[in-house]
């Protein structure tokens, strides 16, 4: 653009150095002396065609055409040229002392009657309203450049059209990413806490390496395996480990990558994906979050003909259509197996469902060892203690815990990660970071202290409740205070007594407020919500209601649009619903009365613990144990308490 503008400016401002510029006096003198080179004869015959205003000769030429001679001519003598628009006169001057005629140009002023002057002097001339001024020169100069730019634009447009056409052609191509040897390799050694899943997937690796081992026994390798489990348990990591161990092409794609706004694109991508897989057999196809495309059919807004269902239909055909000896194995992962289409889960498609659950204590120890590998740990760091203090944590939670501890150690300018950072990281993962700068009034601080003390005392005195690990009134996350507890061991079921103790523990904060202040606050809203949910499950799911008995209430009708759990239709009468509400209220009231009775009989313990919380802000398990031994009226047998906790209660 800069070069273009420079050339244009030069063309507009350029002047011909061979043209002699005449001023008014010089032009008048040339007229008087007839110094113009007019041709073989220096005078024009009188009369004839083309008479001007004064009856003298004026030669007219068509607009846009100029006679020979003048500007741009071959310097042949001829009549002068008068340009009315630009008010210029051009022509040739007689040579002085021999030589060639000289070209001249004269710009006459506004209102000057040039035709009258030339007619009176009997000088022939032609008139032309068009001017070959600077714009004409600019156009002449720029024409080649404009043509070049036009050709370049046309070539670019053609290339772009071809590219767009190519993109439209590739729109139906699979977006699967193929793992290459250059990418970081993940093996089964990097997977911990999922031994059963690793064992199941190891068979797939062995089949790809040595299929004859299975085929000679008449065994048919599973065509597909579905990894099922909560978020963060390592389903995708397991698939990557299979890719790293198998040494075969590995195609990875997300379930949402199949579906687009255009009809037929999803099915086309499925066909293309399996075509690529057949060309690279043996290989593995991994579909992450397959529930995005594999939801049960017939419940969408498209009337059974939406794009997602057509994609699923094509996927079902491809999975059951390719030869079992082709060496193509399908892996998929989901945390919502309940909403998948039954046809997708039948044998012959996904023959196996591999459950990847939350790790138990040995699994957490292994996972922590994997994530602390290569990190400088202090001598006081006990991996087993951390694992005991994190029941219910997934592999992703533990990885985040170790990373938070490393960040805290770096913030404190330490060379190693110590146990203090690990404990703080657990608290941050459970309840959020501390908010010491949050300003609360002394009255709110006192209410919070008694509220959390109520939770802690009920949890400490009820033998069926989980042991209390820490109580703090330092705001964390959205909570003004937190009481943390944890089970003594991994728990996979709960008794009715444990659930009732959990209800009393949840309502201990509200009971403490009423006992001490004879007033209640909004601080127990989350406690009440959680307690109501537990009580409802006891009545409608667990059959723990004495009046309603062993019956499950509130069955789902199978609607799967946006997930099965969205639509639940009561399968009981209004009378039963009334009894359910009464039973829920009875259970909650019973648990609340238990908590209130404990706090009334242990008022001195409540006052002392609240006072220590106001003074120290945080009370650990050992401090609480000493207070219980000293002030409790009816202490239950003490239980061994681990040094850490996870099940945070936000009061």
Curated annotation (Swiss-Prot):
PROSITE patterns: AAA. SUPFAM superfamilies: FtsH protease domain-like, P-loop containing nucleoside triphosphate hydrolases. The keyword Glycosyltransferase does not apply. Keywords: ATP-binding, Cell membrane, Hydrolase, Membrane, Metal-binding, Metalloprotease, Nucleotide-binding, Protease, Transmembrane, Transmembrane helix, Zinc. It is found in: Cell membrane. One of its GO terms (biological process) is proteolysis. Zn(2+) binds at residues 451, 455, 527. It holds the Pfam family AAA. The gene is ftsH. In the central section; belongs to the AAA ATPase family. Residues 156-651 are cytoplasmic. This is ATP-dependent zinc metalloprotease FtsH. The active site is at 452. ATP binds at residues 229-236. It is a single-pass membrane protein. NCBIfam families: FtsH_fam (TIGR01241). InterPro entries: AAA+_ATPase, AAA_lid_3, ATPase_AAA_core, ATPase_AAA_CS, FtsH, P-loop_NTPase, Peptidase_M41, Peptidase_M41-like. It comes from Rubrobacter xylanophilus (strain DSM 9941 / JCM 11954 / NBRC 16129 / PRD-1). Binds 1 zinc ion per subunit.
